[in-house]
């Protein structure tokens, strides 16, 4: 039995204002039973006693007449790779919006050629539990953050865009503390200006 509970948040700044701020939750489970070369699945977005019992009965019906052996020799290799931080809750919505506005102002101040800036945050926290038929319970918590900046520059009627982003299964602070976000803006701007100064490749004859 595999159970998953996920909550996520996306905040987008575009054209000098917050374009959208979305929050969503998703949960569900999946049953899997294997007997010989026969595999049966059952899943639902509703986690309740009734739903779990129905799924269990469906699996039993699918594997009726089949007999399997429970494998107790599987070794526990689980390791804790991520911290317990919740990116969705670690900072208030206001503080995230304030940082996005700082990013917007900084990127626009890099050069007069900067005409448009888009920046967004994505935060996610996923909780997972796996219950094996022998009663063994395994669980994991997986944070995820993503931070992207897009800079559009214009010169002599020509427009080019540079996009750069960072992310990983850790806290926002890794990318935002000590104004580390400026490095992301600088790289997006560098890519945009490099594209702006580029020349067309020679055409074949």
What are these regions (language model features)?
Residues 1-205:
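Active-site bordering "gate/hinge" segments
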